[in-house]
Design a protein with these regions (language model features):
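PP2C/PPM-type serine/threonine phosphatase catalytic domain
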Residues: 1-261
Length: 261
């Protein structure tokens, strides 16, 4: 595979996204700030780097096994049980081994796959986190209408904060959502695809900050990440209170990788 583009830009002062590139692997990691801090675990920016290094350095027959091994390595390093609440991260990983190409997604990162024969494109994603976030945004919009406040103001209200906390407690539990934290079992719940190298033309990995550009990322033969990023930031700047384009926060971290075959 040939990595032709990469982008990793912050939505606020601290960028919690991370990109890791290796000889045969590419990885987007989207870290999440814990609602309750645990002194035993690293800060988000350190966690995403440690997790990426642990996954890339893990031994395993496929990406789900490598992700599980990487999470377990990090869990032991921190000396915490699997159910530890704290930092977490969504993943989108691409790995080439000979004539085989794997794509793995966990959480709300995603991958867009295009084929040489024109079929598709195919989106590899998981919707559990997006559904929960969508429910929160819907509640923020309801409060916006009923109380005459900006959508972004509604996030600070007790009922919205409690909703966010309730959703976070569903992490890595049946009926909730699965994401990289400290539970290796989460890797079994990722979306895993295996392709023949010869059938692929392009794969794009992206964090949920790019979710609004899904159609462009999937549809273009080779999307320009920088151009899409600039369009996104312009739209956000024109709607800083989140009233026109309701969302959880004014701007999110944005990451993407384009690989050609």
């Amino acid at each position: 595979m040939n990595i032709t583009q990469q982008l990793c830009c912050p939505g606020a002062a601290e960028n919690q996204d991370y990109i890791r590139l290796g000889e045969d692997i590419a990885m987007v990691v989207d870290g999440s700030t814990p609602l309750v801090k645990d002194p035993r675990v690293p800060e988000v920016r350190e966690y995403v780097r440690l997790l990426a290094d642990a996954v890339v350095g893990a031994e395993g027959e496929d990406l789900p096994h490598m992700v599980a091994a990487g999470i377990e390595t990090l869990r032991r390093r921190c000396g915490v049980p699997p159910e530890t609440e704290g930092v977490s991260a969504a993943l989108a990983i691409l790995r080439e081994t000979g004539e085989q190409v794997e794509v793995f997604v966990l959480g709300d990162c995603a991958a867009g796959v295009r084929f040489r024969d024109g079929r598709g494109p195919e989106l590899v994603s998981q919707e559990a986190v997006s559904r929960l976030d969508g429910a929160v945004v819907a509640e923020m919009c309801r409060l916006h209408r009923e109380r005459g406040i900006d959508v972004i103001e509604a996030r600070q209200l007790p009922e919205v904060r409690e909703m966010l906390l309730r959703h976070r407690r569903m992490m890595n539990r049946p009926g909730g959502y699965w994401i990289a934290g400290f539970a290796p079992e989460a890797a079994r719940h990722g979306s895993h695809r295996v392709y023949r190298r010869e059938e692929l033309s392009r794969v794009v990995l992206f964090s949920d900050g790019f979710s609004g550009q899904r159609e462009a990322l999937l549809g273009a033969e080779e999307p320009c990440l920088q151009e899409l990023y600039q369009q996104l930031r312009q739209r956000e700047a024109a709607d800083s209170r989140c009233n026109r384009y309701p969302r959880l926060k004014p701007g999110d971290d944005v990451s993407g990788i384009v690989a050609l075959f």
